[in-house]
Amino acid sequence: PMHGTFDARVGKYTNIEVSKKELDYEIIDDNLVVNFNHDEPTLPGQKKLEITITYLSHACLLIETNEVSFITDPWIVGFAFASGWWPKSPPPKDWSKIVNSVDFIYISHNHPDHLNLFTLKYIREDMEYIVPDFESQSVSRMLIKNGFNNIFKAQFQNYYRYKNTELLLTIFKSGDFRDDSGLYFTYGNFSFLSTVDSNNLNFQKFPTDITLFASSFAGGASGYPLCFETVNSTEKTKVLDRNRKAIKATVRQNIQRSGAKFFLPYAGFFTESAQRDLEILQNNRKNTVENFTDLVASTSLLNINEFDKYFFNGSNLFDYQNIQRDSLDVESPEVIMENVFQNCLFSES
């Protein structure tokens, strides 16, 4: 896979200190038999209710109903990964007012393109957060450190009703060693599943007949191979091409597995805006939304480049439009970085 070489004899990758857990198995009549539990996690919901899904930025979605509203993974302004990533989408007009008006915020994991301190500083301190109950508490600890204490830690695969509303939700763990998660919720007979950018979500045990499936799609998130001088340009191109194809194949499999009526590509709208990263920007080719126009026959693509707000009545999409947006940061990335990092300088003497 994209990690590199896996040595099945010892159950470890050769290039990173990661092991895979051995499956329980039996040998019956010289056949290797592995038993899988394929129970489908399903939340109830029968009523035909209206719900609106709005793309705000990168992995940040706004979900609105007559009873409750929330956003996911707020990164709207500022940079991520030590200024390596910048938002590709201009911020929505009055975005801080929009964000502060919701009932709660779901944060999938603590990477800075999902839990972003530049964005969080604009959010009211009494905001409610629903976060995964990771053993390390990696999300909740960071929120508490930055002044947020209204935190509900959802245990994986437990189902929750939000107060007295029709919103039912559960959080799935990624199927690997990382602190990562995805979100599944229903509102009436509208259902939503997002893998965000996690690997092997819930060990691929998906609910089926999903109304809207959302996931990352772009790739280009790793410093490997472009930032490695030990890899020649030809090999870099091969690795990047392989990774993009692998991501496309995974997305298609997940769409098929979920039986989704609609697919929303998101969590991939970032760019390398700093002048020092021009070479990365020019060579770090990513998948585009348009690369997913040829989907499973029963699934329709929601193209954020065309419309970013979608209106559903139950499982039926009945309208779409564009929201107003401000311009991107007036200040250049270099000015922003200078202001941020000027107090972080150190002397080599």
Predicted stretch roles:
Residues 1-12, 134, 203-297:
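Cap/insert and terminal regions of metallo-dependent hydrolase folds
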Residues 2, 91-160:
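Active-site HxH/HxHxD metal-binding segment of metal-dependent hydrolases
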Residues 2-20, 25, 34, 281-349:
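C-terminal regulatory/interaction regions
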Residues 19-48, 132-190:
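Metallo-beta-lactamase
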Residues 45, 66-110, 117-118, 122, ...:
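Pre-active-site segment of Zn-dependent metallo-hydrolases
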Residues 56-66, 160-216:
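Catalytic core of the metallo-beta-lactamase
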